[in-house]
Regions:
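Transmembrane-helix signature of polytopic, membrane-embedded enzymes
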Residues: 242-264
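Transmembrane-helix motifs of polytopic, lipid-linked glycan transferases
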Residues: 224-248
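Short acidic/glycine- and proline-prone juxtamembrane loop motifs at membrane-interface regions
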Residues: 270-279
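Short juxtamembrane and helix-loop transition motifs at transmembrane-helix boundaries
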Residues: 8-17, 38-40, 213-222, 237-243, ...
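Specific aromatic-rich, kink-prone transmembrane helix
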Residues: 280-290
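Short hydrophobic/aromatic helix or loop-helix immediately within or flanking a transmembrane segment
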Residues: 163-228, 232
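Aromatic-rich transmembrane-lumenal/periplasmic boundary elements in polytopic membrane proteins
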Residues: 115-184, 188
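Membrane-embedded, hydrophobic transmembrane alpha-helices
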Residues: 2-134
Length: 290
């Protein structure tokens, strides 16, 4: 009989010393993105301009991370948000201008599809590890806990509780207010995570009664389910980008190129375990794919 005792240990105890700070990853991702996507033979192209503006939003994220770490630097926080809002406004204008462009030649990446596949696989593995050991979003943990509460209630008691009470719980725990369907997105992962952790505790004779098993395993269930949901969200985004390019443009290599660019964005690594960011992006993307 195989016991999944590995799930009861923090991932940072398994992968000791695996840590890349934001400045290092910012530098490496910038260098890789420029080397792969920048057209050095045609510098004055719209693609190069888009790449520069896309990567140019990364310092704003770093400013926000530093301001959150210090909790005192209000200037960095304000400057970071102004930078992000300005960059978002530029991309809104850019998308509105895109249908008016008559000539948009396709420019291939500076690496062949085989190398792009190897690089994308390595980056996806790195992103999964970061989501497994990095800081998890409080909204994801709160959603998993609410999903667990739903699973423990009977159908009659669940139907009697209005949805605004769930929103109040999320707002109390995270400071944000989500809709009543937010825990449902995490329930698919919360159910097997609950069964996996509780069965492991029972098999190891950590606790005896079922009720005590649930109480002991609840924090571990929330962490595992939130991280697993974030990982599945990233995988859904990768496959969505590839399939969107294949179905809408008939170019599988283009989808692979876009997916690797997503994996190179420092933002994806900075908040790898934030389900409130990843799931929203995955749902928006798949609404375009289908």
């Amino acid at each position: 009989q195989i016991h999944f005792a590995i799930t009861l240990r923090p991932m940072n105890q398994i992968l000791q010393g695996f840590e890349i700070n934001s400045v290092t990853w910012f530098t490496v991702s910038w260098a890789l993105a420029i080397a792969i996507y920048f057209k050095f033979t045609r510098i004055w192209t719209l693609r190069n301009l888009d790449l520069i503006f896309l990567l140019g939003m990364t310092p704003a994220w770093m400013f926000l991370e530093q301001s959150r770490a210090s909790d005192t630097d209000v200037y960095l926080n304000r400057f970071g948000y102004i930078w992000l809002f300005s960059g978002t406004f530029w991309w809104l204008v850019r998308m509105l201008m895109d249908p008016m462009l008559r000539r948009r030649p396709q420019l291939d990446a500076n690496i062949n599809p085989s190398g792009m596949t190897v690089l994308g696989t390595a980056l996806l593995a790195f992103l999964i590890v970061e989501a497994a050991i990095g800081p998890v979003g409080e909204s994801g943990v709160a959603a998993v806990e609410e999903a667990g509460d739903w699973l423990q209630r009977s159908p009659q008691s669940s139907a009697e509780i209005p949805s605004h009470l769930y929103q109040a719980v999320s707002e109390k725990k995270t400071g944000l207010q989500f809709g009543p369907a937010w825990p449902l997105l995490h329930m698919v992962v919360a159910i097997p995570s609950r069964a996996l952790v509780t069965s492991d505790l029972v098999s190891n004779q950590a606790v005896a009664p079922d009720q005590e098993v649930v109480q002991v395993a609840e924090p571990e269930i929330s962490q595992i389910a939130a991280r697993t949901t974030a990982i599945l969200g990233h995988v859904a985004i990768i496959f969505g980008l590839v399939l969107a390019a294949y179905w809408h443009y008939g170019n599988l290599v283009l989808g692979l190129t876009i997916a690797v660019l997503y994996l190179l964005l420092p933002y994806a690594v900075f908040h790898a375990a934030r389900t409130d960011h990843v799931l929203v992006g995955a749902l928006l993307l798949w609404s375009v794919v289908v």
